[in-house]
């Protein structure tokens, strides 16, 4: 009986704590997915984060590196208590801290890039008590200067070719549009001419139909006059014969 009586207040406390206490939000880290560089140059590995808590003095940043074709991961940089530290390794004296935790920035710069630097870099940020979250990674690809220039030239050639294709396509469409418009205009003019011819033909037919009775009347008059003249001429001849 006593145990059941104790369980009820405990369960009630758990329920109240679940309702009153805010849920824990995971810290979110963001990086680029791919970064390119050339031998001897430098590249910035950008890393930003978002935390539901105020940025405390206990915020920490850790960068790890995993070479291509390798399963091993190395710690190359660490920031804690306001102090950056570079771990011993291939990036010793080649890493520069350019981040600012107050501005939620955890970026670093790699100097004097080499071909062996190709690999995946992981950025991990902790802001106690907000320590739950996933790291973000960025892949670095280092190329020779000649290869980079060749890639740049190839990209320019492809861009120019695409631009030419677009221009030619636009010209073809414009020519086709103008041709179709001209055809429509010509058809309209022809139809207008045909309508005018039909109208003239109708008018002429009406006029001819109106003039036909007049012509017939004129012919009848001329025929009557001719017959009268013939009649008069016949009477005169007969009188002459009688004399």
Swiss-Prot record:
Q: Where in the cell is it found?
A: Cell membrane
Signal peptide positions (record) = 1-26
Segments in the Extracellular topological domain: 27-154
Q: Which residues are exposed on the Cytoplasmic face of the membrane?
A: 176-243
Has the keyword Repeat been applied to this entry? no
List where Basic and acidic residues composition bias occurs.
222-243
Entry annotated with the keyword Cell division = no
Report membrane topology.
Single-pass type I membrane protein
Paired cysteines (S-S): 47-123
What does the sequence similarity comment in the record state about its family?
A: Belongs to the myelin P0 protein family.
The task this protein performs is described as: Creation of an extracellular membrane face which guides the wrapping process and ultimately compacts adjacent lamellae.
Name of this chain's protein: Myelin protein P0
**Gene source species:** Xenopus tropicalis
Give the classification, highest ranks: Eukaryota, Metazoa, Chordata, Craniata, Vertebrata
Which gene name belongs to this protein? mpz
């Amino acid at each position: 009986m006593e145990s059941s009586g104790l369980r009820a207040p405990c369960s009630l406390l758990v329920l109240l704590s679940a309702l009153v206490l805010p849920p824990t939000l995971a810290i979110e880290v963001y990086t680029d997915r791919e970064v390119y560089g050339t031998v001897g140059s430098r590249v910035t590995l950008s890393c930003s984060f978002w935390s539901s808590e105020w940025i405390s003095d206990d915020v920490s940043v850790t960068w790890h590196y995993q070479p291509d074709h390798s399963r091993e991961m190395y710690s190359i940089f660490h920031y804690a208590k306001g102090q950056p530290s570079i771990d011993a390794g291939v990036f010793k004296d080649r890493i520069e801290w350019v981040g600012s935790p107050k501005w939620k920035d955890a970026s670093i710069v790699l100097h004097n890039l080499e071909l062996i630097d190709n690999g995946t870099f992981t950025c991990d940020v902790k802001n106690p008590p907000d320590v739950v979250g996933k790291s973000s990674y960025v892949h670095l690809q280092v190329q020779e200067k000649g290869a980079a220039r060749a890639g740049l030239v190839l990209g320019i050639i492809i861009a120019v070719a695409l631009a030419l294709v677009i221009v030619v396509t636009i010209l073809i469409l414009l020519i086709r549009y103008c041709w179709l418009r001209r055809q429509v205009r010509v058809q309209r003019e022809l139809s207008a001419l045909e309508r005018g011819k039909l109208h003239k033909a109708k008018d002429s037919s009406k006029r001819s139909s109106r003039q036909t009775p007049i012509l017939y009347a004129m012919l009848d008059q001329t025929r009557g006059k001719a017959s009268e003249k013939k009649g008069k001429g016949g009477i005169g001849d007969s009188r002459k014969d009688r004399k």
